[in-house]
Amino acid sequence: MHIISLFAIYLVTLTITLNAEVWKPDKKPGLIPTSMFEVDPSLEVTVWATSPMLYNPTNMDIDHEGRFWVTEGVNYRGRNGTRPNGDRIVVLQDTDNDGKCDSSHTFVQEKGLIAPMGVAVFDNVVYLSQPPDLIAYTDVNRNLVFEPEIDKREVILTGFNAINHDHSLHSLTSGPDGKFYFNNGNCGAVFTDKSGKTFYMGGTYGGSGANWPADHLKNSGRESGDGHVWTSGFAVRMDPNGANAEIVSHGLRNSYEQILTSFGDMFQNP
């Protein structure tokens, strides 16, 4: 029998308590019975991890050792400020191989992390999608904890709308061509790649409840450095260092992530 392990995640709208480092609700969430899931008889649904190992996850990736790297969005939208020290990337592990998570710790927590929507792990480099930035954390000593005095933090690209909005910068993935791919919802962007080429990603979508560092409304219809006019949500292909960026799709509403086959065909929701 094949087993499907799921994160059991529950949005708890309760009065909260704060401590110096980690936000915690004052009550435990109720569990949803796995019997509620309808699957093929050859499959089984099991719970792999629950709160307090993680809270309100927004994205995840699995590294070559089977560890789960999860972004959290406790400070999402109207609850911004709930966790004063900022949101986190947490690392989850099953250390005794019994099919359940038994270890959870913080990789990085910063006040500037506000419901980041994407995480990708390549060896000891962790990429975080935190508008307006696409950030790379290099875990130099490979201890699974970001230490500013030892490790490296680099902004690969910047200029993506909107901060604390789910129509913004989403997760990065890799393709068989050695390129990196990522997408952004229809909040728009104005960003310059490491080759010096500027892209104006316009559109008509806007609203309150978020911070908009780029004026995508003003730049709607403006020609980008590649000679094209792009609009709305989009996907980008680039070198791992942020150079030679190309727009590979646009006109989307809010594509959350993309996946590429071994032949380079890309699939994404619109």
Task: Annotate each PLM feature.
Residues 20-270:
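Beta-propeller domains with acidic blade repeats across secreted/periplasmic ectodomains
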